[in-house]
């Protein structure tokens, strides 16, 4: 973790940042159906297969995937948001969120239940390109 860089980004980024916190991806488990697919040469499937071999029988928590989903599709209709300010508060990288209607950042708030989000995200992960 590069805490100084994180602090600089949080303080100086010129536009709002949408934060997908620990609590968002922590309960969204994905990958279980993906690794059972009958496809070859899938880097996503291969990576998840390795993770499952290391002890994630119910799927992987999906922090990064929720951030990607929102970056590509937007937070509606999946999440509500709360405006506020994100801060890196110490040299170990601990951070805080302060709700503030005039803050420059947004934080995702659960709207669609985690189980439904897992199905949605995993369906995107399982998508195969159409041959032309």
Give the predicted meaning of each segment:
Residues 1-4, 8-11, 15-132:
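Conformational coupling and interaction surfaces
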């Amino acid at each position: 973790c590069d805490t100084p860089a994180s602090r600089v980004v949080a303080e100086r980024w010129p536009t709002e940042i949408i934060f997908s916190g620990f609590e968002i991806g922590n309960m969204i488990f994905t990958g279980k159906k993906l690794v059972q697919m009958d496809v070859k040469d899938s880097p996503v499937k291969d990576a998840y297969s390795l993770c499952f071999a290391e002890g994630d029988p119910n799927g992987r928590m999906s922090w990064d995937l929720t951030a990607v989903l929102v970056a590509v599709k937007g937070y509606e209709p999946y999440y509500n948001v709360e405006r506020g300010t994100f801060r890196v508060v110490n040299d170990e990288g601990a951070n805080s969120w302060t709700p503030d209607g005039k803050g420059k950042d947004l934080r995702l708030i659960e709207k669609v239940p985690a189980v439904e989000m897992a199905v949605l995200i995993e369906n995107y992960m399982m998508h195969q390109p159409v041959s032309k």
